[in-house]
């Protein structure tokens, strides 16, 4: 039986980016220590953790030592090699579960899983060859979106296809990998629900947020989202069903398209989520604390929203707006401490309370 952790226990986190950083800060508020495992030097999370191991995920000796030094392991990103998980599981528990990771790592498995639960996704075809791409295009038509099945995030690993697209060139440009072709969804807007489930099966969902993306990267999340009461209820119930079906422990982010009043699931992420950052200033207990509570075996906290919020990411050189934001007393600023400013890189975010 999974144990309940007491304050003073150590939580291991795979990945040292901003999500790991904010998980560490939430853990510290509850009296936990954290230990970060991350390949890169000086990641954001290392500045707020009590332990840091810099090593690759195929360094099994370092992984074993890391796992044996903590009481539970969680992660800030989903593309973790299977071999690393094998090593860790011999030493301690991992939350969320490997089943959730397995499904979320593969867009084809993810779509099939969602459809099996009875929920809608974009239409799709598996593509494993140039000929398969031609067949898929004949079935789904254009416009459509061709994506790698694995390792895609923030708009990477995908390309929009039109009537004049050359299947041979497109197939080669994506590295001749296993792909999935998704039919185009004509949606009015995008939303997401951040849900959580505890070890004893308690489920709590934050209010849906309305998301705006540019170049495949989340720019803003506004809460409350533009939804009918029924749509809001449906989005939360769908998220709860996914949590239950996976016997999930921790926080999950489920993204939806709203198309002709219909909710179509885009994808889910088995971790804390960028579109949930608004909870840091809009709720008593935010997504990061909720995740720590869940994996520690604690009861979930009160995630009820107490104000309307707009969250905006600071991307690339938008970090240069920092001085103006510091002078603006109406915003709560969250900076990640990243040194290198790169196009498309998330450098921080801010929450503006609008009511």
Task: Show which residues each predicted segment covers.
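Extracellular/lumenal mucin-like low-complexity stalks
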Residues: 313, 318-321
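An anion-binding loop in the catalytic cleft
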Residues: 341-354
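Active-site nucleotide/adenylate-binding loops and adjacent lid/helix of ATP-dependent enzymes
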Residues: 103-192, 196-242, 355
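ATP-binding N-terminal substructure of ATP-dependent carboxylate-amine bond-forming enzymes
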Residues: 1-109, 131
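Phosphate-binding core of ATP-grasp and ATP-grasp-like enzymes
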Residues: 173-227, 232-265, 269-277, 289-302, ...
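A conserved FAD-binding loop/helix module that cradles the flavin
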Residues: 280-281
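Short glycine-/aliphatic-rich beta-strand segments at the starts of folded cytosolic domains
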Residues: 305-314
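A structural micro-motif
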Residues: 32, 50, 92-93, 119-122, ...
């Amino acid at each position: 039986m999974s144990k309940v952790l007491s304050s003073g226990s150590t939580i291991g986190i795979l990945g040292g980016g901003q999500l790991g950083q904010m998980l560490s800060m939430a853990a510290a508020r509850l009296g936990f220590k954290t230990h970060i495992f991350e390949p890169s030097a000086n990641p954001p999370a290392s500045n707020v953790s009590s332990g840091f191991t810099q090593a690759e995920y195929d360094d099994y000796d370092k992984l074993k030592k890391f796992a044996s030094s903590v009481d539970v392991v969680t992660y800030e990103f989903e593309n973790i090699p299977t071999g690393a998980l094998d090593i860790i599981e011999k030493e301690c528990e991992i939350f969320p579960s490997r089943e959730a990771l397995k499904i979320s790592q593969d867009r084809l498995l993810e779509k099939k899983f969602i459809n099996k639960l009875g929920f809608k996704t974009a239409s799709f075809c598996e593509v494993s060859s140039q000929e398969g791409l031609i067949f898929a295009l004949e079935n789904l038509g254009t416009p459509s979106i061709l994506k790698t099945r694995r390792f895609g995030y923030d708009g990477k690993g995908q390309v929009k296809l039109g009537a004049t697209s050359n299947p041979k060139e497109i197939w080669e440009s994506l590295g001749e990998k296993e792909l999935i072709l998704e039919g185009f969804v004509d949606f009015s807007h995008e939303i997401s629900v951040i849900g959580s489930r505890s070890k004893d099966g308690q489920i709590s969902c934050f209010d849906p947020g309305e998301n705006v993306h540019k170049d495949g990267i989340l720019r803003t999340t506004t809460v409350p989202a533009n939804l009918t009461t029924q749509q809001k209820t449906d989005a939360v119930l769908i998220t709860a069903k996914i949590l239950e079906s996976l016997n999930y422990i921790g926080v999950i982010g489920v993204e939806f398209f709203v198309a002709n009043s219909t909710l179509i699931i885009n994808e889910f992420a088995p971790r804390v989520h960028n579109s949930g950052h608004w909870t840091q200033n809009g709720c008593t207990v935010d997504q990061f604390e909720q995740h720590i509570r869940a994996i520690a075996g604690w009861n979930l906290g009160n995630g009820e929203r107490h104000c309307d919020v707009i969250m905006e990411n600071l991307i690339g050189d938008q970090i240069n707006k920092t001085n103006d934001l510091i002078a603006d007393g109406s915003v709560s600023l969250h900076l990640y401490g990243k040194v290198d400013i790169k196009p498309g890189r998330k450098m921080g975010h801010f929450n503006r309370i609008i009511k």
